[in-house]
Amino acid sequence: MQARKITEQVYWMGAVDWDRRMFDALIPLPDGTSYNSYLVQGSEKTVLLDTVDPPMEEELLDKLEDVQKIDYLVSHHAEQDHSGTLPAVLEMFPEAQVVCTPKAKGMLVDLLKLPEDSILAVEDGDSLSLGDKNLKFLHTPWVHWPETMVSYLEEDKILFSCDFFGSHIATSDLFVNDKARVYEAAKRYFAEIMMPFRNQIAKNLDKLKDLDIQMIAPSHGQIYPDPSFIMEAYKDWVHSEPRNTVVLPYVSMHGSTRVMVDHLVASLVEQGVRVEQFNLEVTDIGKLAIALVDAGTIVLGTPTMHAGPHPYAAYCAMLANV
C-alpha cells in the first residue's frame, strides 16, 4: 500500500497488518491491526510522526524513498509498535531529530540505544514550527504508558493521538466509514488497554476540550473525520454510571460450578437484572473486557484448585482488577 494523502501536505505512511491475531501475547486481534505513521511537510521543515512495528519496517521505508528530507521524528510513545523502526528511519535520515517527552527520552535511549544528542525532549504545551504549519505537543501520561503525548497540527486542526482513540482494525479504508464496526473495535481497544487508567483518561480528555479538533489520526485503526463520534464514546466509557448488568465469568472443571452459575443467572434474570455470562475456558477475552466497561457488578465463578482459584479465574481477576 502506498503513501496516502490526508490533507494538503499531510500523508499516511503506515502499514496494515492483516494477519496479526495476538497483541502483547495476550490480546486477541480478530480483525488484524494497523501501525499508523504520518508525514507532515511544512514550508520549511518536514516531520514524521511515529513509525511502525519492526516486522513491517520495509513498508514504511519504501514509502519514505521519495521523501527528500526529514527534520523531525515525533515519538508519541516508546512502545515498539510505534517506536521500533526509529533506528532504521534515523539511518535513512541521519540528520533528523527525535522529538518526545522527557520521560520517553530515557526510555528510547534504554530500549533502542538511541544517542541522547539525537533526541529533543519537549515539555507539555511546547510547539514546533514547520514554517507554515505548527505542531503543539500535549503530554498525556498513562494513555497508556507514563511517557505518552499527543500532537495537534494547528493549521489543519488534526490531533495525532497515538494510542488514544485507537482501534485494532486492518482495512484498506483510510477513514472511518462504518461507525458501528469501529465503535465495537474502539470499545474493545479501550477495554483491553485503557480501562485500567480510566481516571487518567478522564483528565487527559479534559486537556483536549479547548482544541478545535476537526480530525483525529490515531496510531492504530482508521482516521476519524468526525472526531466527536469517538470523543463522545470515550466520555461515556469513563464518566457514565455503571449499568444494572452483572458480568459473570466462570470456569467449571466437572460441571458443579456451572450448576451454581446457572442457578444464580436464573435468579438474577427473574429479578430483572441483565446478565452477561462467559465461560473462561472458551471465551474471547476481548468480549469479556468490553462487557466490563459498562457493568455495575462482576461475579467470578471458580472451583477450588490446589487450595486456590482455578488459574483461568485468577487470570480473569487480574484483568478485571478485582
Where is each model-derived feature located?
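Conserved beta-strand hairpin/beta-sheet module of binuclear metal-dependent hydrolase folds
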Residues: 3-64, 150-153, 157-160, 257
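Metallo-beta-lactamase
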Residues: 4-8, 46, 100-218, 224-225
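Active-site neighborhood of phospho(di)ester-bond hydrolases with catalytic His/Asp-centered motifs
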Residues: 49-51, 69-78, 98-101, 159-162, ...
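Active-site metal-binding motif and surrounding structural segment of the metallo-beta-lactamase
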Residues: 54-99
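Terminal amphipathic helices with adjacent charged low-complexity linkers/tails
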Residues: 221-246
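Short helix-loop-beta junction
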Residues: 262-276, 294
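Helix-loop-strand module that forms the ligand-binding subsite of alpha/beta enzymes
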Residues: 284-322
